């Protein structure tokens, strides 16, 4: 596993000797998240405050792209470690509040221009969604809510991000079918009963 931090000015910090990592992928909210731990020397701490994004690759393939939320350094008798945690690129839309607006007719290009492009997010591909008359953006909505409502409720598709951090606004493609059978070497199994988070949402206009 190879982890790389990118600073606000474009500098890259290649993380040494990754010892532990965890990636969580999903659609919508909560967005993708990551946590990675590597060996770290105390004298290298100053540059971490300038890191804004993270990329992980395995065997030459990018497996995660996201934003840095937290850097934690620790030391014990075995030496120093660095733990970096953050979320996928959807975090940029989730963390920013949209300006209230009323569109006489809103197109996908309008939504991308006003609510996605300002955050430096690349769009990989997009379906041809119909224009929406009298589309309103409520004050207090996140940029993600604006994009999600336009695409999901008026276009019938769910926006998502790929592992390179690019926004995908198109139906799912046919993928591979993976089967865990009796001959599969399962090393661990987790059963989670999650009793928190958004279970349902009612929007009233």
Role assignments for model-derived ranges:
Residues 1-4, 148, 171-205:
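Acidic, small/polar-enriched beta strand-loop surface segments
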Residues 1-47, 87-91:
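Juxtamembrane "anchor/assembly" segments of surface/extracellular structural proteins
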Residues 8-9, 58-59, 180:
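Structural motif
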Residues 32, 64, 80-82, 163-165, ...:
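Envelope-exposed proteins and targeting segments
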Residues 35-36, 86, 97-123, 138-163, ...:
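Amphipathic, non-transmembrane alpha-helical segments in extracytoplasmic/periplasmic proteins
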Residues 41-123:
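Surface-exposed cap/loop segments at beta↔alpha junctions
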Residues 128-137:
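Surface-exposed aromatic
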Residues 157-178:
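Extended amphipathic alpha-helical segments with heptad-repeat/coiled-coil character used for oligomerization
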């Amino acid at each position: 596993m190879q982890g790389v931090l990118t600073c606000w000015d474009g500098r890259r910090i290649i993380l040494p000797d990754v010892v532990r990592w965890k990636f969580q992928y999903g659609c919508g909210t909560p967005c993708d998240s990551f946590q990675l731990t590597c060996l770290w020397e105390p004298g290298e701490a100053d540059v971490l405050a300038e890191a804004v994004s993270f990329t992980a690759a395995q065997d030459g393939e990018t497996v995660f792209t996201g934003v840095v939320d937290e850097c934690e350094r620790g030391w014990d008798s075995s030496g120093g470690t660095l733990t970096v945690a953050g979320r996928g690129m959807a975090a940029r839309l989730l963390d920013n509040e949209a300006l209230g607006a009323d569109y006489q007719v809103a197109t996908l290009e309008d939504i991308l221009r006003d609510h996605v492009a300002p955050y430096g997010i690349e769009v990989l591909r997009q379906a041809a969604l119909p224009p929406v008359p009298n589309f309103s953006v409520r004050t207090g909505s996140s940029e993600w809510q604006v994009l999600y409502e336009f695409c999901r409720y008026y276009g019938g598709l769910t926006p998502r991000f790929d592992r390179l951090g690019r926004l995908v606004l198109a139906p799912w493609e046919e993928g591979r079918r993976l089967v865990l059978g009796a001959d599969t070497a399962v090393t661990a199994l987790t059963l989670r009963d999650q009793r928190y988070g958004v279970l349902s949402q009612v929007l009233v206009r």
